[in-house]
Amino acid sequence: LFRSTWKEKVITQLTGGLAGMAKGRKVKVVNGLGKFTGANTLEVEGENGKTVINFDNAIIAAGSRPIELPFIPHEDPRVWDSTDALELKTVPKRLLVMGGGIIGLEMGTVYHALGSEIDVVEMFDQVIPAADKDIVKVFTKRISKKFNLMLETKVTAVEAKEDGIYVSMEGKKAPSEPQRYDAVLVAIGRVPNGKNLDAGK
């Protein structure tokens, strides 16, 4: 079992520093869930009730969240997104990385170094699909020594059982039978949080 107290301490120091800088510059910070209620108003629901903020202009920097697919049991603690993977609570013996992008490969590299057996499934014909094919070709040759790469393959079903996460796939490199994994990292992209703010109002 891994302890994340040091990481949490660093995060607390960084966020505390930012809060201090904001206070020093007389920036008012309102914590809570905000939604636009009009062209020049925002309502924030926090622990102490609702606060209405009036403004002339607004900068939306709401970040993003991982894409979730309906057939994946995301509520199971063995099904991870990138934030879960960074918690490093345990090192799975066998880890499936869904998505051959930067985040998935980076996390796969970390867990391989810690001792995990890594499978990577990517629906396109190369990892990091947006990158230059010549560069990716060299990179793929290198990581193929560490990972079991399944290109032109996609996940069709994910089932959580007591002894593991069972994953069915189809495509060029798909195994004929469902595969059992100790954990599955879903790294298939992210979507912006802007829609949650009712910015259209």
Language-model regions: role of each:
Residues 28-31, 35-46, 53, 115-201:
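A Rossmann-like FAD-binding core segment of flavoenzymes
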Residues 62-116, 121, 149, 200-201:
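Glycine-rich dinucleotide-binding loop and its adjacent helix/turn
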Residues 56, 93, 182:
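Conserved acidic residues
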